[in-house]
Amino acid sequence: MASPLSPSAWLAENPMQSDEQLYVVMGSASEAKPFAAWQTVAGAKPPQPVWAGTPYAGWNEVMPYVGVVEPGSAFLDWVANTRAVDWGWLAVSSCPQEVVLNHLKGLTQVYLPEDQPVFLRFWDGTQFLPMLQHLGDGAARMLPVFQRYLINGQSLAVSPCPLAATKPSPWWRVPVPLLAHLAQQSPQVLIDNLLQWLQEQRPDLYTAFSPAILQYKVAYFVRRPGIGHAELADYLAAQLS
């Protein structure tokens, strides 16, 4: 695996064009507190909350943000030095910030193959980078506003596609092969999605176990073939009988 790239090295390898801007997408849920770091060192126009104007506008503790970063900003030094891998990422786009914001807002929730909506942690590089890598150029159909990414020191380029109109969340459907790939690469992604589904759709099962026991049981469940919501519900119900 190539050595991690710093933001300055990445920008030197991929110089920005005159019509491009450098964006940061970050999540408040990270213990690294990237928003606080921005407030300390950036001192420029504040990033915008992605979920503003949605039913989740008050979820400040887990709010994702998007902002424009100047190439010489001290915030990029913070990015280079942080050890966190879930804080967010950098990307280059020729789109205005409002367009970028609306496309990210459209990914607030996505559909799993069984038509169940779940939140997408698009700001979390540990989840989003494997998705982009597996989708390849197809990632542009999910998020067409970005051409180049730097996520946890890894550079990724996506072939551009025509900029589609923004759509209200949820609209994007997670392909079955991608879900299987994520389960192989990082079972925790699948575990988190299943736990979220239980919390939203089957609170009776979600609250029937302590959090640690439920995590263990779901982690055990995902080892088997034929993973699905109905199968998980049957498995947990059998554990209670």
Identify the role of each PLM range.
Residues 1-241:
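Terminal low-complexity "docking" segments
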